[in-house]
Amino acid sequence: MIIEMFDKVLLKTGETAYIVEIYEQGVAYEADIDKADGTVETDTIKHTDIEKKIILYD
């Protein structure tokens, strides 16, 4: 799966995140992660942390 800037993704933890930086395609990204308590945490995620890309529009 190809991940692009600002894609919304579902993480394997069940959280959603927006990609804000691509460090290396298919390897690592910086993401704004929507936490269960309503906060947003910016963190580095691996491609293997991503369950699927969420399509916002066609």
How should each PLM-predicted stretch be described?
Residues 2-51, 56-57:
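Basic/aromatic-rich interaction segments and small domains that mediate binding to polyanionic partners
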